[in-house]
């Protein structure tokens, strides 16, 4: 079940454990925000480009299309996984 009543809702993480849901009509502004956020990622390469780490750890929630950047040897990554 999605985190909101709407199956069209997409989760947008703000921090490691906090986020909000948005309807797809607002996704272009959210995509821009995620591009600008230093720790949100879709790939390891994106983390390296942002300088936020070298590993993109995906959220375990299928409704979140992004991950969080970590250094591959960081203690925070071990806690996230």
Swiss-Prot record:
Write down the InterPro entries for this protein, in alphabetical order: Albumin_I (IPR012512), Albumin_I_a (IPR032000)
Q: How is it modified after translation?
A: Three disulfide bonds are probably present.
Q: Pro-peptide positions?
A: 27-34
What are the transmembrane regions? none
The alphabetical list of record keywords is:
Disulfide bond, Knottin, Seed storage protein, Storage protein, Toxin
Q: Which GO MF terms does the UniProt record name?
A: nutrient reservoir activity; toxin activity
Q: Superkingdom of this entry's organism? A: Eukaryota
SUPFAM superfamilies in the record: omega toxin-like
Q: Which Pfam families match?
A: Albumin_I, Albumin_I_a
Q: What is known of its domains?
A: The presence of a 'disulfide through disulfide knot' structurally defines this protein as a knottin.
What is the recorded function of this protein according to its Swiss-Prot or TrEMBL entry?
A1b binds to basic 7S globulin (BG) and stimulates its phosphorylation activity.
By what name is this protein known?
Answer: Albumin-1
Lineage here is: Eukaryota, Viridiplantae, Streptophyta, Embryophyta, Tracheophyta
